[in-house]
Amino acid sequence: AEALREVYGERLAAVYDKSSQTVPYKAGLNAVDGYLMGKVAAPTQEVSENGHRFLVNWEEGQKTGFFLDQRCNRELVERYAAGRTVLNTFCYTGGFSVYAAAGGAKEVCSVDASERAVQLADENMRLNFGDSFPHTTLACDAVEYLKQIGDRYDLIILDPPAFAKHHKVLGNAMQGYKRLNARALSQIRPGGILFTFSCSQAVTKELFRTTVFSAAAIAGRNVRILHQLAQPADHPINIYHPEGEYLKGLVLYVE
């Protein structure tokens, strides 16, 4: 906290330590949540990213309440969204949904298992577009919903939570990634764009790519890689700690 205060000075109102849900597996650390310096009146605040507005609750939300490591990838979704019908699965608070709408999507559907998450996604859409944009939300299992969508969507985003937080569950996790991607690939419209991610540090980018290729074969679809994605430069990777490259993604064109 003191080091951050030295850098940011009076601009820094508070520092909140949120360790209880984020410490490494079996790290043996005494993780606690609470203020290290200062305090703010309300845990939910409005933030701005590339001109888009978001409500963020850093105390109760996942991790810091907003996934800053996906901001460059959200910008990429904005570039591809024009004229497309978009499905944002595991939407959390709707970051990708807001960017898709800003990019000119016809409509956006945001899906998450958490009722509170989809409420926040809807609030963030209204914060940016009022009631004018055709946005729907569903609080349900995203994998099950993918079975039902037919060929309604031509841009699908798969950004699930970490399926493998450690190597002991890696095999089951890869089967989960394969099923998820196969369902999306089998349903997306011809000419559609699939954004698919893994944030599991135990999953290498090579293993993730191979798993997605297997999913494409299962779905019987021909795909081309348009982009291979990673975390931004302010989430640097130590060359001696390859597991630090935890975020990997693919943008696929599906014929």
Locate predicted features:
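Non-catalytic substrate-recognition/targeting regions of SAM-dependent transferases
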Residues: 1-66, 75
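Conserved class I S-adenosyl-L-methionine
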Residues: 83-92
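Conserved SAM-binding loop of SAM-dependent methyltransferases across substrates and taxa
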Residues: 93-106
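Conserved SAM-binding motif I beta-strand of class I
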Residues: 107-112
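S-adenosyl-L-methionine
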Residues: 114-157
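Mobile active-site "lid"/loop adjacent to the S-adenosyl-L-methionine
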Residues: 153-183
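Helix-to-beta-strand junctions that scaffold the AdoMet/dcAdoMet cofactor pocket
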Residues: 188-190
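C-terminal catalytic and target-recognition region of SAM-dependent MTase-like enzymes
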Residues: 193-255
